Every structure is written in structure tokens, then in C-alpha cells.
Amino acid sequence: LTTKIGKCFVGKGGGQRSLSEQGKKLALKRARLVAAAENKLEVLREEIEPYTNNDHILIYCGAAQMLDEGQDRTVSSNGDTRQISQVVNMLGNDLGMTISKFTSEEDIKERSILKSEFSLGNLQALAAIKCLDEGVNIPSIRTAFMLASTTNPKEYIQRRGRLLRKSEGKEYAEIFDFVTLPFSTNTAAGQTIDDVRGVYTLVNNEVARGMEFARHALNFADATDVLDDIRESFKLDELKLMLQLSGQDFEEQPWA
């Protein structure tokens, strides 16, 4: 998809380029695939295992369908499983945690009960879709695993703000923001600038969001070390300079 998107740029005045309508559709399709990347579940299992006896945990899921590796589709079918269902099954059945979905499928009364049980610690975790974007207040959240991310600064700053809301006994919140890369940093480090140029916007947007989260974090140094490794491996600084010198500025495109 990234290669196809790279072929959909059209010229504008002043040497600028923008995506065609077809390119924008492909970019949205790629965004959904990023949101539902299969290996996010594997990483979630590793990261959440130390928290299986904790409570007040939010897993923020994508609305996209889970796709097996190699599949290039985003339409629903009977063979697809929503990411949130995979999460609930893994935490509830595999890890023995008490967890419930928190989505638009639950009515206002059900949501109210879930929020109450969650706040009391009777329900360890909530797996949610879009709740941080819909004005839902759950200030008792202490740990959040963000499987679904956005490249819109306004949205991810708003989501962070909702997670950091004050609650009795809550001094801070732990936020795990899952960064999705097209391939590993080791692979990227061994490639040329031309090889990684096609994924510049995708990776740069992920790093930019990570840096925004990191700059106010207590573990700023550790977080920025990880992001700097990504930046260096994918040659983001060199690519940014090349794009600027050629009059292109892909990273400012809101659809990327």
C-alpha cells in the first residue's frame, strides 16, 4: 500500500505535491491496517502480563478488523475478528483477568454499571473503542495500553488528557503507546535512503506522536532513546532534509 500511495502524488503550485483522491483512499486503508496490526496483540500480551493482578486498566482498541499477515483488505467478513474481541478473549480467557468491552454496543445504563465496577476495582480492565474521543470520563484509569493511535495531534493530545485526569489515589497514569513500523529497525538500518523513502510519512507520524507523549513523561530519557533509534534506523532526518530541499513536505498532510 505504501508503494501504491507513493505513486499517487500529484503536482501543485510552487513545487508542492499532494495526494490524489485515490491516494487518500489508500492512505485511509493503510491507516486501518496500522490500527489492526496483528503483532500488536503479541506485544500487548508481553507488556500486560506484569499487570494481570492490577486494576483500573484501559486497552484502547482500533475499530478495524484484524487481518492475517499478507491480507490486503479492510472490508468486514465472517472470517474477520475485531481487535477488541481478540483483546477481551486474550485477557479474559488466557490471562484470567476480569475484563469487559466498553463500546457503542453497550447502552447508557450498561456503560454506567461498567464504569462503576471499574472504578471500584471489581472489574480489572475495559477494552474500549473511541471512548476517549466521545467525551466519556473515566478518571480512575491508571494504566492504558493504546493499540489504536492517530496521527492527528489534537486527537492524541486530547486522549492523553483524558487519561491523566485526577482521581482519588491516582498520582500519575502509565500510558503504553504502541508504535507501528512497516519493518524492524534492524531491517531499516541495513537499507538505503531510497529503500525507506516510501515509508517516511508513516514512520515519521508514529515517531512524532511518540515524542509528544514522551516529552511530558517521567521516563522521558528511556522513551526518547527508543524513538531516536527508530528515527536513525529509518533515516528520518536525512529524508526530511531531502524533502525540504526538493520543496516537498509530506509530513504535514493530515491524511497521512
Identify what each model region corresponds to.
Residues T2-E117:
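Conserved helicase/translocase motor-coupling segment
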Residues C8, G13-G15, T192, E212, ...:
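Compositionally biased, intrinsically disordered low-complexity regions
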Residues L44, Y51, D55, A214-T224:
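Short secondary-structure junctions and interdomain/linker hinges
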Residues S77-D80, I84, V196, V203-E206, ...:
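Intrinsic-disorder-associated interaction segments
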Residues G92-A221:
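Conserved RecA-like P-loop NTPase helicase motor core
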